[in-house]
A protein has these predicted regions:
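Short alpha-helical segments that sit at the start of domains
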Residues: 1-13, 84-86, 120
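Short helix-capping/hinge SLiMs at alpha-helix to coil transitions
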Residues: 15-19
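Short, hydrophobic-biased segments on the C-terminal half of alpha helices
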Residues: 40-47
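Short acidic, hydrophobic short linear motifs in intrinsically disordered regions
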Residues: 21-30
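Short, cationic-aromatic polyanion-contact patches
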Residues: 3-7, 23, 57-79
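Key DNA-contact positions within bacterial/archaeal DNA-binding proteins
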Residues: 36-37
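Amphipathic alpha-helical dimerization/coiled-coil segments
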Residues: 75-120
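A short, conserved structural fragment
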Residues: 47-59
Length: 120
């Protein structure tokens, strides 16, 4: 699996976070640091790579806009990315737990996932 870089990753993050089909206009509204020509070009590339699909159209002012939705979940992307880079689960967990931004709630979620996996 190719690693999403730069603006393509930023656009995928917007799509993953919103959890609904979005037009280029909406992506630009949500993340104004992404300029419209960049958003459109990245959407074309993501579409060509079968990472997103057109999920219908909507009116934006007086023009129709295509709405895009991810074909790849964030979880599947992260799993595939870790696998292609040969990152072990222990290395991944170590990096997560040693990061400054992890909260107690996130640690509890990780513990629940580990307990569930252990019970399988």
């Amino acid at each position: 699996m190719d690693i999403l870089k730069g603006k393509r990753y930023d656009i995928m993050n917007v799509l993953w976070e919103e959890g609904r089909p979005l037009s280029a206009f909406e992506i630009n509204d949500i993340a104004p640091e992404l300029k419209m020509p960049t958003v459109r070009r990245c959407l074309e590339l993501l579409l060509k790579e079968n990472i997103i699909k057109v999920a219908g159209t909507s009116m934006n002012g007086k023009v129709y806009a295509r709405n895009y939705t991810p074909l790849l979940s964030r979880e599947d992307y992260l799993k595939g990315n870790a696998k292609s880079r040969k990152i072990s689960p222990v290395e991944m967990m170590t990096a997560l737990l040693e990061s400054d931004g992890i909260t107690v709630e996130e640690i509890e979620q990780l513990q629940k996932l580990l307990n569930k996996k252990r019970a399988e």
